[in-house]
Amino acid sequence: DPCCGYRMCVPC
């Protein structure tokens, strides 16, 4: 699932 505009959840 997209998270913060990326495929993986990363610090914004």
Swiss-Prot record:
One of its GO terms (molecular function) is toxin activity. Contains 2 disulfide bonds. It comes from the Eukaryota. The keyword Ribosomal protein does not apply. Expressed by the venom duct. Disulfide bonds join 3-12, 4-9. Signal peptide: none annotated. One of its GO terms (cellular component) is extracellular region. The modification Cysteine amide is found at residue 12. The modification Methionine sulfoxide is found at residue 8. Belongs to the conotoxin T superfamily. The cysteine framework is X (CC-CX[hydroxyPro]C). Chi-conotoxins inhibit the neuronal noradrenaline transporter (NET/SLC6A2). This is Chi-conotoxin-like 1. It comes from Conus textile (Cloth-of-gold cone).
